[in-house]
Swiss-Prot record:
PROSITE patterns: ATPASE_A. InterPro entries: ATP_syn_F0_a_bact/chloroplast (IPR045082), ATP_synth_F0_asu (IPR000568), ATP_synth_F0_asu_AS (IPR023011), F0_ATP_A_sf (IPR035908). Key component of the proton channel; it plays a direct role in the translocation of protons across the membrane. SUPFAM superfamilies: F1F0 ATP synthase subunit A. GO terms for cellular component: chloroplast thylakoid membrane; plasma membrane; proton-transporting ATP synthase complex. It comes from the Eukaryota. The chain crosses the membrane at residues 40-60, 97-117, 136-156, 201-221, 222-242. This is ATP synthase subunit a, chloroplastic. F-type ATPases have 2 components, CF(1) - the catalytic core - and CF(0) - the membrane proton channel. CF(1) has five subunits: alpha(3), beta(3), gamma(1), delta(1), epsilon(1). CF(0) has four main subunits: a, b, b' and c. It is found in: Plastid, Chloroplast thylakoid membrane.
Length: 249
């Protein structure tokens, strides 16, 4: 157990700090206190948030009894997110719809912005812009939020009895069950980061090697896989929350 505790502490103190320093492309930073902040991630994240908030305001500003095209689309998205949440969490899915929906929409729009918006042609004094999910810090932050959410879900329903899951079905599995909770955010973050990074790199390489028209099918494939990655992340987040509330694996 001492070895396991030391390994976990080393991962938290050193491993995650080193992961946050992973760079792809040219970055620029803001100095806030004693920390260097990836400024391009904040800028593009604000753009994505502004798109989501602006779209929501336009739709709900004047709701119609007979929905318009925009209202129809957002109602469809809401029903889709509700279905995903109910399927994975169960009958107590209601309070978690906003969280799952926010994850899905933020990741979806972030991924698509990387494929559709020409971030890299915007001239900066140093560095370049890219999709928020093209940065490991964003995906790790989203994964850690998911971890906090499923711990909160389990504790709020079962209290301290939630931790009994670590010794089920036998106390021998305690180290493995603890390790599982650390691998969940890692798998979520690296899956999303790796897929979005790969999509962008493939498009950049093809555009540099062949005429502009040829990479278009690959770009459409990237849009499809970007949407799938957003759905996978949101579905797994809902599944983890449902699992923590039900206490099964």
């Amino acid at each position: 157990m001492n070895v396991l505790s030391c390994s976990i502490n080393t991962l938290i103190k050193e491993g995650l700090y080193e992961i946050s320093g992973v760079e792809v492309g040219q970055h620029f930073y803001w100095q806030i206190g004693g920390f260097q902040v990836h400024a391009q991630v904040l800028i593009t994240s604000w753009v994505v948030i502004a798109i989501l908030l602006g779209s929501a305001v336009l739709v709900v500003r004047n709701p119609q009894t007979i929905p318009t095209d925009g209202q129809n689309f957002f109602e469809f998205v809401l029903e889709f997110i509700r279905d995903v949440s109910k399927t994975q969490i169960g009958e107590e899915y209601g309070p978690w719809v906003p969280f799952i929906g926010t994850l899905f929409l933020f990741i979806f729009v972030s991924n698509w912005s990387g494929a559709l918006l020409p971030w890299k042609i915007i001239q900066l004094p140093q560095g370049e812009l890219a999709a928020p999910t093209n940065d490991i810090n964003t995906t790790v932050a989203l994964a850690l939020l998911t971890s906090v959410a499923y711990f909160y879900a389990g504790l709020s329903k079962k209290g301290l009895g939630y931790f009994s899951k670590y010794i089920q079905p036998t106390p021998i599995l305690l180290p493995i069950n603890i390790l599982e909770d650390f691998t969940k955010p890692l798998s979520l973050s690296f899956r999303l980061f790796g897929n979005i990074l790969a999509d962008e790199l493939v498009v950049v390489v093809l555009v540099s090697l062949v005429p502009l028209v040829v990479p278009i099918p690959v770009m459409f494939l990237g849009l499809f896989t970007s949407g799938i990655q957003a759905l996978i992340f949101a579905t797994l987040a809902a599944a983890y929350i449902g699992e923590s509330m039900e206490g099964h694996h």
